[in-house]
Amino acid sequence: MAAARPALTDSLSFCLAQLTAAAGEGPGGGKDPATNETPLGRALLALRTRHIKAAEGIERFRARGGLRPLLALLRRTAAAGPAPSQAASGSAPSSVASAGSTPGHAPAAESLLTPSLPMRLRKTLDLALSILANCCTEGACRAEVRRLGGILPLVTILQCVKTDSIQNRTARALGNLAMEPESCRDIHSAGAVPFLVESLTACQDSQCLQSIVRALRNLADSPQHRLALAQQGAVRPLAELLATAPDPALTAALVRALLELSRGCSRACAEQLSLGGALGPLVSLASHPKRAIREAAILILANLCAQGLVRPALGNAGGVEVLLGELRRRRSPGGSSSATQQPLVRAVCLLCREAINRARLRDAGGLELLMGLLQDPGASAWHPRVVAALVGFLYDTGALGKLQALGLVPLLARQLCGEAGEEEEEGIEAASWDFPEERTSGQAEGGSFRSLRLWLISEGYAAGPGDISPDWSPERCPMPEPSESVSPTPGQTSMSTPRTLRKPGRIPAATPEEPWGQEGPALLLLSRFSQAPDPSGALVTGPALCGLLAYVTGAPGPPNPRALRILARLTCNPACLEAFVRTYGAALLRAWLVLGVSPDDWPVPHARPVHRSQHRELGEMLLQNLTVQAESPFGVGALTHLLLSGSPEDRVACALTLPFICRKPTLWRRLLLDQGGLRLLLTALTQPAPHPLFLFFAADSLSCLQGLVSPTASPVPLPALPLELDSPPPCLYEPLLGPAPAPAPDLHFVLDSGLQLPAQRAASAAASPFFRALLSGSFAEAQMDLVPLRGLSPGAAWPVLHHLHGCRGCGAALGPVPPPGQPLLGSKAEEALEAAGRFLLPALEEELEEAVGRIHLSPRGGPESVGEVFRLGRPRLAAHCARWTLEPGQCPRKRALALTGLVEAAGEEAGPLTEALLAVVMGIES
């Protein structure tokens, strides 16, 4: 049997020839498609079903030049149509209406464009549009269609032919073309959006609606295009369809389109979504079983939060609970990455701007969620935004109490000096809708307003035209926080209201402006907490005080005055006095502000911004505030109770703090001296430190107390012993060492090394009871010319022999003393001191101790030598060490380092150190 003869339409060339002929571009062209529909229809059908769908068929069709006649065919049907104003309410560009067409073709075109198209012509147009839409799935074809001007015919067909199938394929072709940014721009310029919107409202076919929705989604490829779509009313029909769409496929397409249109949500987009009734359906879709629809709906709700006008309605629809639940799910251990949490965090923070949504958020556990974000180091980039959101709860007493219980205050204090991400700037549309603005157009600004604005700028009340709007009113402006009196001292002004940085060219304002930087929201919340009747539990703690002080001293410019007012408010509150004592807060204020030593600067100093005079003034003012509280009847009772009946830790803290905040002699003498506060503090030095700066605080406290006990004491440096004297005392032992000694020695002391040292028997016996008994008594050594001295090295024996022969101040006592930096334990100096005690030479002991003190405890000496000297265990040297440590005028850091060395040297034997320090403080040292 013979094989079947191949059809003509199996040939791509035949199909292209038919297409070219129908388009009027080849031999015999210009035939009316209505009279030539049968061969053309077969060719178009073959192109769509076989040639285009074959492997690389679209590329072959494009390479063989098929797009040009295809577009020409579409152009012929679209060019001679009625004016756009007659066909639709929208308007197409004039180029569409003026496209050229031959008079002979007009009747056919008119018949094509009638509302009831002939079946064959409609089928031809359907096939041609289907082929074009399929071809536009590839980038090369999209580029060529745009180059050949194929967008305008599609817009005209969309405008004029209202058949669902043709609208469907036209929208599909436009949607495919919109995948290229250049084509998307041309489609917008061609005026396709109004016709797509019109078709969206008129069409009933689900497939057609999906194609139109997809085209609108692809046209929303940039912020400018999204805004244009919203301004042309494309969002509301989508929202209305979402509220009534029964088709799951259409619902998915609508959600995807609305997600794209709501990115960077504009005011017009939010208004249309709300008016279209989409908020409720979106909240319902947030629990859809399909993940793609569910997540898209949630992201649309998150995007809508950028517009304040829609947030109250969004909360009424249940959006607050949906967003909180999704953010909680994504932050769970099995949740998603932080990048997917960002839009939800932003949305939840924006929801805190309206009171009604804050109430819903609080009831739905949103405060705990926000606190979890603040406690998460991995979410540090969002911390400024979260803190700014919590400012909305500033006057919600219940929420503030919960936030305080959850540990907000230490997190805020850490926020003041931490390196966190910057808060993203929001537009004016994101402002709270609790006080909606009456929008005034620029054209409506009257001359009176312009005159007012110019006057405000000239007087310095506004920096520029943008600082004040026509909608400004005194009711909308928050009153500045009053600068309350913080201290009766006259030195409070400069730090309580520091100068603000002035921008170049800025006219000084009549009232100083408070800087509002990244720390502004945190300080506002801390200020609110400080206004509580008893804020000590939250703010008078180590972390809170450290955060405030780190901000005040570390700010590159003048700190925010609110931080200074917080500190002043706390120190003026009697309810905070005990907390300042228990937490070493007063000592911290003095160390950080007055002395310039922070916890990070101890024991190794670190470079940081220095404004010492202003900081010192602030510290003295705050301590004066605490002094006023401490010396009041309430303060006296509180301190007495704390010292006598408090816990051991509180008693030590009270004893340490009293010299800083008590100036009345009757008070500090009774508490520290009569009731044992000083001895309690000294005993605690050798116990585990309750604070990282405890020894620094203790050294400073003892020095202050010494100044209170002896207020007229002034630094009296010890006279340095010159190593080379201009007229040294004569050495009485040196004549015995020459080749011709005079007088001649009558005995020699023999050391363990065999060295023989000459001596006079009578002088040695007269200088020491030990040698008197040894050399003049009944011992065998009294009859010997070579007397052994066991356990004595030459270096240690040298000052002994000099002293036995009457040398005083000849420099021999300095010989065994090592230079600073070398240990004294095990040195010749220690051996000489032991020998002086063994040989009953107290004057030599004193001379050696004085030599050690003058070399290692000179005014220019280092604190590391103090502990070395104390380790020798000599009472006089211990007193010398205590005197050097607490010497008036001593550097605070050196004093603290010296006390640290003394504590380490004392070990568990605290008695000698306690007695030495007590004697120096009380001024009773011998």
Swiss-Prot record:
Name of protein: Armadillo repeat-containing protein 5
Pfam families (UniProt xref): ARM_ARMC5 (PF24768)
Residue ranges of every copy of the BTB domain listed in the record: 745-813
PROSITE patterns given in the database record: BTB
Annotated PANTHER family: ARMADILLO REPEAT-CONTAINING PROTEIN 5, ARMC5 ARMADILLO REPEAT-CONTAINING -RELATED
Protein role: Substrate-recognition component of a BCR (BTB-CUL3-RBX1) E3 ubiquitin ligase complex that terminates RNA polymerase II (Pol II) transcription in the promoter-proximal region of genes. The BCR(ARMC5) complex provides a quality checkpoint during transcription elongation by driving premature transcription termination of transcripts that are unfavorably configured for transcriptional elongation: the BCR(ARMC5) complex acts by mediating ubiquitination of Pol II subunit POLR2A phosphorylated at 'Ser-5' of the C-terminal domain (CTD), leading to POLR2A degradation.
Region (Disordered): 82-111, 472-516
Subcellular location: Nucleus; Chromosome; Cytoplasm
Post-translational note: Ubiquitinated by a BCR (BTB-CUL3-RBX1) E3 ubiquitin ligase complex, leading to its degradation. Deubiquitinated by USP7.
Provenance organism: Mus musculus (Mouse)
Keyword set includes Heme: no
UniProt pathway: Protein modification; protein ubiquitination
Alphabetized UniProt keyword annotations: Chromosome, Cytoplasm, Nucleus, Phosphoprotein, Repeat, Ubl conjugation, Ubl conjugation pathway
TM helices/strands, residue ranges: none
Induction: In CD4(+) T-cells, mRNA expression is induced 2h after CD3E plus CD28 stimulation, then subsides and remains low between 24 and 72h post-activation.
Alphabetized GO MF terms: ubiquitin-like ligase-substrate adaptor activity
Entry coiled-coil feature ranges: none
Compositional bias ranges of the Low complexity kind: 82-104
Subunit and interaction comment: Substrate-recognition component of the BCR(ARMC5) E3 ubiquitin ligase complex, at least composed of CUL3, ARMC5 and RBX1.
Stretches forming ARM repeats: 139-179, 181-221, 223-263, 267-306, 307-354, 355-399, 401-440
SUPFAM superfamilies in the record: ARM repeat (SSF48371), POZ domain (SSF54695)
UniProt-listed GO biological process terms: adrenal cortex development; CD4-positive, alpha-beta T cell differentiation; defense response to virus; gastrulation; hemopoiesis; in utero embryonic development; mesoderm formation; proteasome-mediated ubiquitin-dependent protein catabolic process
Phenotype of gene-disrupted mutants: Embryonic lethality, with its severity depending on genetic background of the mice: embryonic lethality becomes more severe with higher degrees of genetic background purity. Knockout mice are small in body size. They have compromised T-cell proliferation and differentiation into Th1 and Th17 cells, increased T-cell apoptosis, reduced severity of experimental autoimmune encephalitis, and defective immune responses to lymphocytic choriomeningitis virus infection. They develop adrenal gland hyperplasia in old age.
Residue numbers carrying Phosphoserine: S337
Gene name, Swiss-Prot/TrEMBL: Armc5
